[in-house]
Amino acid sequence: MSRYGNAPPPYEEVVSVATPSYVQQPWVPPRYFAPTEGRNSIVYDQFPTCYDTTKLFLVDNKSADITDLNMQNDHSHFATTVVQNSEFTPREASTQHITLDNRSRWGAKLKTLIQTNLPSVTDYMYTNSLRVKLMESYDEATGTATYEWHDITLPEGNFDSGRIIDLLNNAIWELYLTYGRQNGVREDQIGIKFDTRNFRLGFDPLTNLIMPGHYTYEYFHPDIVLMKGCAVDFSKTRLNNVLGWRKRYPYQPGFVITYDDLVGGDIPPLLDLAAYLKKPREGAGGPIIRALQKDSKGRSYHVQYTDLGEVTGYRSLYLAYNYTSDVTHLRKSTVRSWLVLTAPDITGGAQQLYWSLPDMALAPTTFRPSGQTPATFPVVSTEPLPIAARTIFNAQPGYAQIVNQNTSQTMVYNRFPENAILMRPPQPFMVQVPENVTTVTDHGTLPLQNTLSGVQRVAVTDSRRRTCPYVYKCAATLEPHIMSSRTLQ
């Protein structure tokens, strides 16, 4: 017997044996031999099945659509035909359909274009009104006063940040003319002033006075000056964003700033320069250092004595935010605990837009597909509202303000030029203006329904799900493609 066992079988014997099953070619179902046959077909009602792709155009101002479809709509909520056939009227196109092969899951790359003409002060964006609490009446004999809340409304328009502050102060003055003046309230008791200065520059801690005798007339940040009993309510407005003040916890309800909130923000009185510059009397010692009590027209600064020294009857939000620890020796300002100073935003804090294509896109599982109004349409994409705040540097704001006052007769903004607190605030050297920016956005792939109507509804809503009347151009393109097979579960 051989040491290595039997010899291997001959070649002819091996090849004559049937091939084992584990080395045979696998069996392939018929549909895999033609993987694209009919699975990417797009069917128009008037054409036979075609295998090429198509583009869908959503345009807000097709002339053929306006009369039949959009007489009661606008550029942010409209209907448009997507069957590209000029022989069809919009009514006929509404009976047509585009059928995407239902054996596949379809998606489309969504690209949009939006143009807006949104002004900075408008009722739509809640940037034209706020509530203020002012002195309603004053009894000189008893010294008692009553305070009431009033709504002030600015005229709508596209204004810069400095003009908005001027309009706010003018609205406060008009309220005084309507109510307070008729009931014994003096001009120095108006109680609310919007300003832009830092009233603490030049402060002497020894005398508690502004020793230069004048408040520095330079722009720092929008400020709110209040007297006792007065308040400003920003609960239903975005003007606080325009002024650069926000709540530290913005989702909490209510936003009221009162005089009592501005602890440590007392505006220091001015040095009485007229008394200081007088020659000292014989044996009187040095110059007279005392607080200025009233302006040249007799309007009082309401100077009063406190534990911290002499202060005026006015409190500044800007001072309370920045200088409370210096004045009251507190570790942290009470205003800082719930307020935050921000860069002014002339847009009022413009938010986002939502896209809805209720007749085309598959609704997300969290939305009910039964919505019949723009406020209830399923949201398929979002983008920022196309408006931005642009900053323009003005190296000579004071010169520009003087020229403007003398050429444009803007004395109405400076009704009390003799009063150091009530005078017109300085204009900013960094002027903000709103700019509507055309945006082209790629939203990625959007899942599509398999049957598309020849007329499609398009809705672009704001953060409150309202249609936006300031959208004046809205267009979109969709390029359908297959995402996957519907048989793959």
From Swiss-Prot:
It comes from the Viruses. Its main location: virion. One of its GO terms (cellular component) is host cell nucleus. GO terms for molecular function: structural molecule activity. Belongs to the adenoviridae penton family. Major capsid protein that self-associates to form penton base pentamers, each in the shape of a pentagon, situated at the 12 vertices of the pseudo T=25 capsid. Involved in virus secondary attachment to host cell after initial attachment by the fiber protein, and in endocytosis of virions. As the virus enters the host cell, penton proteins are shed concomitant with virion acidification in the endosome. All late proteins expressed from the major late promoter are produced by alternative splicing and alternative polyadenylation of the same gene giving rise to non-overlapping ORFs. A leader sequence is present in the N-terminus of all these mRNAs and is recognized by the viral shutoff protein to provide expression although conventional translation via ribosome scanning from the cap has been shut off in the host cell. This is Penton protein.
